[in-house]
Amino acid sequence: MKGSSALLVALTVLCICGLTRAEDDNEFFMEFLQTLLVGTPEELYEGPLGKYNVNDMAKAALTELKSCIDELQPVHKEQLVKLLVQVLDAQEDT
């Protein structure tokens, strides 16, 4: 249940940001995921979310989401990072 809630929060944040162009969407989403996996909540606000006004409730939700990700078993988090690298490499090839 916590994982489903975390995914819902992540998708909600993406919708709230109101991204419109496909390339920008992909770039934002990949930077957002990368920061979510290996960064800090503060890096989210300074990086991919830096140009958006993130309200206190959204910040609390992102902190909770980051906490859920940080509590993943190391092997699971490692696999998510590998998947992200694979996707990033595939994007560079196109």
Curated annotation (Swiss-Prot):
CDD domains: Secretoglobin (cd00633). The keyword Secreted applies. It is found in: Secreted. Keywords: Secreted, Signal. Its main location: secreted. GO terms for cellular component: extracellular region. This is Secretoglobin family 1C member 1. It comes from Rattus norvegicus (Rat). The gene is Scgb1c1.
